[in-house]
Amino acid sequence: MSGFRARGLAFACVALLSFVPATARGEGVIVALGDSLTAGWGVAPDEAYPARLEMRLRREGYTYRVINAGVSGDTTAGGLRRVDWVLHASPEIVIVALGANDGLRGQSPQAMRANLEAIVRRLQAAGARVLLAGMRVPPNYGAEYTTEFQAVFPAVAWSAKVALMPFLLDGVAADPRLNQPDGIHPTAAGHQVIADRLWPYLRPLLGQGK
């Protein structure tokens, strides 16, 4: 997921720089902060799960704009560096979907947890509600590492009292019908499944007071 990082960053910059404040548009803002799985590597912008979530919100009668702040190759450390930038959009809700690249690079679960906790704290301090999406690594990374890695997400969610989707790629991972040839990045159909699986976790956060 490290390829096309510059293109992903440029896309996210355009998404945020073109943002019109919610007060001016009469709508709330949701930001999806993630890596290439969020950016929609290999699919059209309107096929990535953030765009699909916005379509679902409209169908359900909600007036939210969903900003795709996915950057290909990003890690939790990179996400932490981008928090202030994300907050320029005055988000009501932030979906934090980071950690996949930390795992693929074998980075420390303890460092990943510290980064995620810092991200969540800063978002909460700004008044945003957070939905944390968990990640997994392949079993060939070893039982000890995979166990420690996967334990990070519920631990962060519990300590920060935020909503948790246990696995962003639930129903998508390892299904060749829903993934591109690399076996990592979802197809348009896979992104639709992600949006559908995210919805039950996002729905309770909509319209809550800050």
What are these regions (language model features)?
Residues 52-55, 59-62, 78-210:
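Alpha-helical cap/lid subdomain in secreted, periplasmic
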Residues 73-77:
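Acidic-and-aromatic substrate-binding clefts and catalytic sites of carbohydrate-active enzymes
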Residues 1-12:
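Bacterial N-terminal signal peptides that target proteins for export
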Residues 10-20:
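Bacterial N-terminal signal peptides
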Residues 23-72, 82-90:
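Serine-esterase "nucleophile elbow" of acetyl-processing enzymes
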Residues 3-5, 19-23:
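N-terminal twin-arginine translocation
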